[in-house]
């Protein structure tokens, strides 16, 4: 039996095989290459980087837009007339795409570090291109459908900017090995590091301030009660808000067909009542064309248990679920009585009925009558509508005049307005300080996230309207606040550490490159051994080597005819019999 022994033994490289196999389906050793990547593959790497960066921004947008998820779903409902949580498929697709591209990015960077040729598998190329096109489509859709929400990105950077800078610095420093290998050849790559080191010069945040200048904690107003804990605009919702220590209650008021002010946000009753069961032919009619008796007969809680708009029903007790199912539409008079009994203020917006409505011209007086007939003090009511404001002030002088229009201070004083209710995108720190200095209070809406509440707190607002008073109740202090000196120290320290690490990597890379180049100059092909593993010499191995030598002689320069030409030049020639092989040497001995 002939014993066969491999001439060349390779070291197993399972990790490298997995790396190149998953990225480019190159599982075999002979498929891998250390050659420079082709321009085509470099182009696909660029597309992969673009997809990853776009998804990074897209993910950040949806992370910060969590404050307004309900607003997004409400806009979808107004367009489709069907209530659904549209954020779930978007978040699932975004998370999947980001995870996929991030994984491919890591594999690509590992290829670069190990000097492997980039060769993205064709299936990956199709998926990456599909992800890129889908994300671009999503960005265009949001820009058309929800354009105002882009402001949340700019505002959130005031809060997250210092930490994003440190995170980006850490990532670039961690990738210093790859960057250093490029900077050795292309010095302009160092511009990226220089920009990162100087970014804090352009970062400004209201939370970078002395703690002694921090104002009092902003009061929290229950916007439509506590709609995450109970159906919006119901007595149960306002009661839940009062349990969270809110200072005021906010509502949207509509006038019924018989002149009764009641609480309703939507134009129709379809979303928040069972009007489709009791009045199916009128479910798309304007809510103001129902009389109070019809409105009172509707359930205002079953929809909450069915749709679960905030994913909170599973945490409700059985008692609260039964109570929710029995909720009815709340009138303005009921809200005023509840506020008077608990010594809370009330702020509401008033919607004018359509032209065909019998109370189209009487809607303001209907609301004033409800206020005057209740037991609430006039100074506890914050009047927002701009219509007939002078007549309202004359009829009830003690009402707190509030406006949702950002006007100059002089004009606000002329109208007798003492409080501004602004969207958070309009609440700039400089304007807030200006209004506060003129004794004009600022109320900001909607504020549902601790980070946004902290930002408004540091900006100096007096109150915020929130759908989540139970969450803001757990924020006794701003999430973070630091002085300019503290931030400067953190900035300089992190930059110095990064510079030291990157310089160390650069020096090591340069020395390593020079060492390899010096090794190339002393390279001798004869030093290459046929076997990577040392084995004890055997007769079989010697015979195999002898056969290889003779085959090379017969196929190449070893023929007698070719070698005979060199004898005239004084060069020695050898015949096959003159070659002393290890086997012949052993036989001779």
Regions found by a protein language model. Name each.
Residues 1-589:
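Phosphate-group recognition and catalysis centered on beta-loop-alpha active-site segments
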